[in-house]
């Protein structure tokens, strides 16, 4: 099954798992160059990047409940790209702060 075939709920669930579990687990081990370690920091960076600014100026809280299918898909893809090293998390974090 590809990301394109997933429902909005499945995409959001995958995004939450990646930012709450996968990325925080990778940060102190194989991705020590990442500037953040905590789940809420990964979520802030991903959401700010998707929204093109401070996420809470664009989405009601909690953000994950208000993501469109397209936004959830973009969030999952961005997480995957960050993990793969094809997107610079350091630069995204700077833009987000």
Labelled PLM ranges:
Residues 1-97:
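Positively charged, phosphate-engaging catalytic surfaces used for nucleic-acid and nucleotide handling
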């Amino acid at each position: 099954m590809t990301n394109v075939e997933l429902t909005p709920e499945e995409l959001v669930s995958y995004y939450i798992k990646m930012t709450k579990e996968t990325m925080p687990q990778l940060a102190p081990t194989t991705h020590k160059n990442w500037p953040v370690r905590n789940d809420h920091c990964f979520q802030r960076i991903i959401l700010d990047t998707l929204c093109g600014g401070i996420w809470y100026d664009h989405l009601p809280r909690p953000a994950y409940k208000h993501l469109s299918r397209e936004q959830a898909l973009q969030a999952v893809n961005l997480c995957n790209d960050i993990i793969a090293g094809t997107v610079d998390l350091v630069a995204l974090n700077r833009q987000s702060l």
